[in-house]
């Protein structure tokens, strides 16, 4: 477990990941915890170790884990911002890729995230520098 300055813990492959093998990460609001489900990400992206796939990288797996970390970090930022979104959701909504719209539907139907917070998190999971800047601004 890793703790960072905003009194958050970062954990990996907890029971929550086993309970839902579709998720790559989650944010526990009550316990200030971000959980990254690396085993789920590996399975969903056909991860292969070096013996199974020499000279091939696992770019898709690495990307999925980074996106999950940025997505869940966005929820931490929202919590630091009095449980509100940071950006203008109406402007962000139009930028959602169809695959992210499907993921958004899944997230809002299966988890407690509100539509606006999930839209923001899905948009920002592709914007590492912006997430880093907002973490510093709202949480540190």
Predicted regions and their residues:
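Long, contiguous secondary-structure blocks with strong helical propensity
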Residues: 1-9, 54-60, 73
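Short pre-active-site segment immediately N-terminal to the catalytic Zn-binding motif
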Residues: 40-68
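Structural recognition of the beta-strand scaffold that forms the well-ordered cores
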Residues: 35-36, 76-78, 123
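Metalloprotease/metallohydrolase-associated module, dominated by Zn2+-dependent proteases
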Residues: 88-140
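Solvent-exposed, acidic/flexible segments
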Residues: 58-70, 79, 114-118
